[in-house]
Amino acid sequence: MRTYETVTILKPQLSDNEVAEFLNSAKEFITKAGGEIVSEEKLGRRRFTHEIDHVRDGFYVYLKFRALPAFVKSWDEMAKLNEQILRSIVMLSIEIKAKAQTVK
């Protein structure tokens, strides 16, 4: 399994309860596919620099999870069909290890 990060932008008219419901259903979607949640964060409502589907702001949700590579396609299909989602992107999470420096 690989580690992925996703940022999903939800429609601004959703209530806090609806955002929480989406987050729970997204976590359930990941775990039912055999994945595991590493971390989650509600980033809140933010204004866009340009309109997306005639909307000026949205509610950002961040999830970090471990899943099989084939799961990403399932996530993308779900995001396209879910009317609460304006945009969603999944990225492969790469851990960068600091290199030790020697002092002369």
UniProtKB/Swiss-Prot annotation:
GO CC annotation: what is one? Answer: ribosome
Instruction: Quote the Pfam families the UniProt record gives.
Output: Ribosomal_S6 (PF01250)
Q: Which Gene3D superfamilies match?
A: 3.30.70.60
Q: Which InterPro entries match?
A: Ribosomal_bS6, Ribosomal_bS6_sf, Ribosomal_S6_plastid/chlpt, Transl_elong_EF1B/ribsomal_bS6
The species this protein belongs to is Elusimicrobium minutum (strain Pei191)
UniProt xrefs under SUPFAM superfamilies: Ribosomal protein S6
UniProt KW keywords? Ribonucleoprotein, Ribosomal protein, RNA-binding, rRNA-binding
Any idea what this protein is called? Small ribosomal subunit protein bS6
Q: Give the similarity note.
A: Belongs to the bacterial ribosomal protein bS6 family.
Task: Return one Gene Ontology term, BP aspect.
Answer: translation
